[in-house]
Amino acid sequence: MDLLQFLAFLFVLLLSGMGATGTLRTSLDPSLEIYKKMFEVKRREQLLALKNLAQLNDIHQQYKILDVMLKGLFKVLEDSRTVLTAADVLPDGPFPQDEKLKDAFSHVVENTAFFGDVVLRFPRIVHYYFDHNSNWNLLIRWGISFCNQTGVFNQGPHSPILSLMAQELGISEKDSNFQNPFKIDRTEFIPSTDPFQKALREEEKRRKKEEKRKEIRKGPRISRSQSEL
C-alpha cells in the first residue's frame, strides 16, 4: 500500500460514521447498544490501520501520514462538535435519531478514540504537533469529556483509552503507576526500536531546521523608504 492509498484509507476511517438505526427507547437505549457493537467493528479497523502504519518502518512517511491524518481528524472533530452543540445533543442523553446527528456523534466518539490510539503508539510524533496547538488541546478535552459521558467506554477493552490518552497528553494528572503500555513495548507495532528512534531524531532535527528557515524568511524586512534614507 503506497502513501496515497494509505492516506485515502485513513480518511475513510475518519469520515465514515457508524450510526445505529432503530427508534425504540428503554432505560438501556437500544440504538446506543446497537451502536456499541458497530463501534467494536470500527475499532478493529482503526487498530489495523495503525498496525499497518507502524509496519512502514519509515519515520519520514509516518510523519507525513500523521501530519495529514491529524489535521483531518481534528477538522472532523471540530465540525462534529459544531453540529452537536447547535442541536443541543447531550452525550448522556438518548442516542440521536437524525442521520446528521448520528454521524456527528459517531465521528466524535470514533475519532477521539482513534486519536487516543495514535497518541499512545506514536507519542513523540503526536506531541510534536499537539503540544503547541491550543485549539487541538481544547477540542480533545471536549472530546474526552463527551465520550466519558456517552456510556460507550464504560466497559470492554476500550474503556482505558480515554484515561491513558488524557494522562499521556498531560490533560489529567498522571497516576503514580501510570505507564503507556504501547510506548514501552513496541514489538507488536514497530519491528525495530533502535532504528526508529534514530530516524525520529533525524526527522525532528530536519523539521526544526525547516522551521528556523521559515522564521528567517518571515523576519522583519527593511522597507523601501527606510533603505532610501
Curated annotation (Swiss-Prot):
It comes from the Eukaryota. GO terms for biological process: angiogenesis; embryonic hemopoiesis; embryonic liver development; placenta development; positive regulation of MyD88-dependent toll-like receptor signaling pathway; positive regulation of Wnt signaling pathway; regulation of ossification; regulation of protein glycosylation. GO terms for cellular component: cytosol; endoplasmic reticulum lumen; extracellular region; intracellular membrane-bounded organelle; membrane; nucleus. Residues 1-22 form the signal peptide. One of its GO terms (molecular function) is protein-macromolecule adaptor activity. A motif (Prevents secretion from ER) lies at residue 148. A motif (Nuclear localization signal) lies at residues 206-213. Keywords: Coiled coil, Cytoplasm, Endoplasmic reticulum, Glycoprotein, Nucleus, Osteogenesis imperfecta, Secreted, Signal. InterPro entries: Coiled-coil_dom_con_pro_134. O-glycosylated, with additional sialic acid modifications. Residues 196-218 form a coiled coil. The keyword Nuclease does not apply. Expressed in cervical gland, cervical squamous epithelium, endometrium, stomach, kidney distal convoluted tubule, spermatogenic cells in testis, mammary gland, liver and striated muscle (at protein level). Also detected in placenta. Highest expression in testis relative to other tissues. Detected in T cells and dendritic cells; highly expressed in activated CD8(+) T cells, and also expressed at lower levels in CD4(+) T cells. Glycans are attached at residue 148. Residues 193-229 are annotated as: Disordered. Interacts with TADA2A. Associates with the PCAF complex via TADA2A binding. Belongs to the CCDC134 family. It is linked to Osteogenesis imperfecta 22: An autosomal recessive form of osteogenesis imperfecta, a disorder of bone formation characterized by low bone mass, bone fragility and susceptibility to fractures after minimal trauma. Disease severity ranges from very mild forms without fractures to intrauterine fractures and perinatal lethality. Extraskeletal manifestations, which affect a variable number of patients, are dentinogenesis imperfecta, hearing loss, and blue sclerae. OI22 is a severe form of the disease. PANTHER family: COILED-COIL DOMAIN-CONTAINING PROTEIN 134 (PTHR14735:SF1). Molecular adapter required to prevent protein hyperglycosylation of HSP90B1: during translation, associates with nascent HSP90B1 and the STT3A catalytic component of the OST-A complex and tethers them to a specialized translocon that forms a microenvironment for HSP90B1 folding. In the CCDC134-containing translocon, STT3A associates with the SRT pseudosubstrate motif of HSP90B1, preventing access to facultative glycosylation sites until folding is completed, preventing hyperglycosylation and subsequent degradation of HSP90B1. This is Coiled-coil domain-containing protein 134.
